[in-house]
Amino acid sequence: GDVKNTGVELALTWNDRIGKLNYNFGINGAYNKNKVGAIPNADGIIHGLTNMLYDNSEEFYRAENGHAIGYFWGYETAGLFQNTQEIADWKAAKNGILQTNVRPGDVRYVDQDHNGVIDENDKVDLGNGMPDFTFGFNLGFDYKGFDFSVNANGMAGNKIVQSYRNHGGNSKSNYTSAILARWTGEGTSNHIPRVTE
């Protein structure tokens, strides 16, 4: 297959001297995108691995014609059900439910094809881990053989996958402390669902 990378990069540096003090300053930034051109197989997809986030987890990344390389693939969510009335309203609007016994604190999954069923056809491109923007700066001083420098770098526009479950079902592993912000009752969270195991 092939991948097309496009973007722009810029770096500016200034070096100068004031008496015996040498100093320099630099900034840099880049905007980049990539897209998979053509994967030469029947479905145009290189599938990601399973069991990567936790035991029995499904494929969550892939490479596919027309998408960024290694994009995240899965169900789009629309928050958490806060109460039983929200569940009833969701079902009445003919939105699909993935869970067999949905309860408050469970995730709402978006029914992409509006057929009332959440299935493989509802999985979509959820973004990718490659940043849209990278940036940085550096600052340095040199005076009579002593020098000082600072460097900073950053990125923005990328997605991150976070699993709060332990890998391998290891009973000696714990959830991260982020699980403390999970749903524990109406209005407590709209991002981390209730704990079910």
Task: For the regions a language model picked out, list residue spans one by one.
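Composition- and surface-driven signal marking solvent-exposed, interaction-prone regions
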Residues: 24-28, 40-44, 148-166
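Membrane-embedded beta-strands that build the outer-membrane beta-barrel scaffold
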Residues: 8-16, 23-31, 135-141, 146-154
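Juxtamembrane/interface motifs at transmembrane-helix termini
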Residues: 43-45, 141, 169-170
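A broad, low-amplitude sensor of folded, mature protein cores
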Residues: 1, 19, 139, 163-164
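Glycine-rich, aromatic-lined ligand/substrate-binding cores of catalytic
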Residues: 77, 82-89, 128-161
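Extracytoplasmic gating/loop element in the C-terminal half of outer-membrane beta-barrel translocons
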Residues: 95, 99-104, 155-197
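Conserved small-residue
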Residues: 1-4, 8, 15-127, 188-192, ...
